[in-house]
Amino acid sequence: MLEIYAVGGYNEVGKNCTVIKVDDEAVMLDMGVHIENYIKYTQDEELIAVKPSELVKAGAVPDIYFIEKLKDNIKAIIPTHAHLDHLGAIPYLSNKFKADIIGTAYTTEVLRAILKNDKIKLNNKIKTLSANSSFKISNNI
């Protein structure tokens, strides 16, 4: 059975995140930030470590706690393109999932640049696909 979870970005520009579940496996499309809310949250303080739960409260990143029950089912995080409203939350939220990050060369290079600039280390593998290619993530997906 196919299930779609509208996690974020459906009522605004930002925090884009959708989970598509097929049987007992799922993929997450996008993990973006809401730029205005992120700036409001971070502008007044020198933050040493940004806490994901605080970013959720500030409305800056998708509320992934809504899909906590699916955490172990998510097999891949796939940012659809390199805009921050589609991949900007990956540095803060992706470590909560045991899933590879899969994207095109441009998208993964933008993500790597953000991670390097912000000195963030992810546990997730970043895989680069050629444009217009296909990739089998799991048995169902």
Protein language model regions, located:
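Catalytic core of the metallo-beta-lactamase
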Residues: E3-G8, E12-D24, S133-I141
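Divalent metal-coordination and catalytic microenvironments
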Residues: I4, I20, D30, H81-A82
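Fold-independent oxyanion-binding glycine-rich loops
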Residues: V7-G9, M31-G32, A105, A131
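Pre-active-site segment of Zn-dependent metallo-hydrolases
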Residues: E25-I78, Y92, A99, G103, ...
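Histidine-centered divalent metal-coordination motifs
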Residues: A76, T80-H86
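Short acidic-hydrophobic, aromatic-tinged amphipathic segments that line or gate anion-handling sites
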Residues: N124-A131
